[in-house]
Structures are given as structure tokens and as C-alpha cells.
Amino acid sequence: MCERCDMREASTIEKRRRFLTASAAMAAMTFGGAGAFSGVAYADAVTKAKRDKLTPDDVLSLMKKGNTRFKNGRRADHNYLAQQRATASGQYPLAVLLSCIDSRAPAETIMDLRIGDIFNCRVAGNVENPDILGSMEFACKLAGAKVVLVMGHTACGAIKGAIDNAELGNLTGLLAKIKPAVAGTTHTGDRTSNNYSFVDAVARKNVDMTITSIRKASPVLAGMESSGAIKIAGAMYGLQTGVVDFFDV
């Protein structure tokens, strides 16, 4: 082989080596923290062993990091078919979320989560009821979830409806559960749904009151929280910003 050919081959090998090194570094940047542990290679599903080693604070940290990836446009390259196959024989979710039905606030997407990472309870205004409490108890006591997260969002239609005393079939009773948050919100200025800062203040108050209701209505969850097995936390999602604001976490 000629000397020039040898040089070309060596150059090609070196370029390929640099490309593979750079690709590995980018993968580490993209997937670091995306799996069950920060710094561990991305996996298609969380395992029981990895989930059980996490603390509630670890789980909340993973959610916060996932939202940071989402809002920065650096979401993990999810292979949903692989995730579906990996979770088909069992599930080991990290958390159970209670969030609003708003189509713009899908928890798995805005926190860059995988199939099988969370249980997701959704109802207008993210209010609890006996069925949801039972679902949360199943998620934590029987399935091993480490966090109960109640997540409201800005510009919430259910909150506006409660403020405006809207009435419509079964929705009337649901909105009645939000009205204590309306009454309990201290806010100067216009206390109508036209005032978005008031709407968002009520939404935040509603999250706080829902957390209090969960602790009072579920001795199972309250006991698990007292023992440190789980954490019950709140958050607000900003529709305009893409940021999930975790309360005191």
C-alpha cells in the first residue's frame, strides 16, 4: 500500500475515533440523570431495585431535572416502543401525580419521563376525592411509589370556573371543591377570572389545600409520610414558561 494511502487510512481512523468519543460525551450529557439514577446510562424502564434505592428527594430531583431538559429543548431521545416492551411484564413507578386535565400540561412530557415512571391521576382543578385517594394509596403502599405530587397550572379553566361560580351538570359539584381556595386566597385588586394573577394565586392555594386534604383524609399516606417512606409535595406548571415550580423542594 502506498504511503499516501496509509496516511489517508490513519486520518480516517482518527476522525472516526474522535466522532465516537464526541458521540459518547453527548449521550452522557443527554441521558445523565434521565434514568433511575443521575449519571447512569439511560434505560428503557426503571427497575424495582433502582427504584427502591431512591429516596423521595431523589425522585423529586429527577422530576426537576427532567423539567429543565424539557424547557431547554434537550429532552431524552425516548424509544417508546422499547419502553412499552420493557414495562409490559411489570411496573415500578417512582411517583403518583395528581394534575389537571388541561391538554397543555401532560406531566410525563413536561418532566421528560418515560412510560412506567409515574402513576398519573388527572381531574379538572387537580382536586382529590375518595377514588383518587384510594389510587394514591395503591400507588404508594402497594406499588412502592416514593412521592405524591399535586400539580396545578397557570391560567387554569377550572379555577376560573370556581371564581365565576360557573354551573354545569356534574361540573358544578367539582368546582365547589375549589371554592374554599378562592375564599382563602388573600389578594388585593380584582378578584375575578379576568385577573390572571388572582387566578394563579387561587390555583396555588388550591394545591396547598389539596395537599392538606390528602393528609387528613388518608391516614395511610399521612403515616407513610411521617415515617419518611414518601413525600407529599406540590407544584405549579407555567403554561407560558414551561417551568414546573416545585413548592419548597
Residue ranges and their predicted role:
Residues 1-14, 25-28:
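N-terminal secretory signal peptides
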Residues 10-20, 34:
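Twin-arginine (Tat) signal peptide motif
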Residues 34-72, 76:
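C-terminal segment of N-terminal export signals and the immediately downstream linker at the start
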Residues 75-133:
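Conserved beta-strand-loop surface patch within small alpha/beta domains used
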Residues 109-199, 246-249:
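Short HxH-centered metal-ligating active-site micro-motif
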Residues 179, 183-232:
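Polyanion-binding loop/helix "lid" in catalytic or ligand-binding cores
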Residues 226-246:
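GST superfamily/GST-like fold recognition
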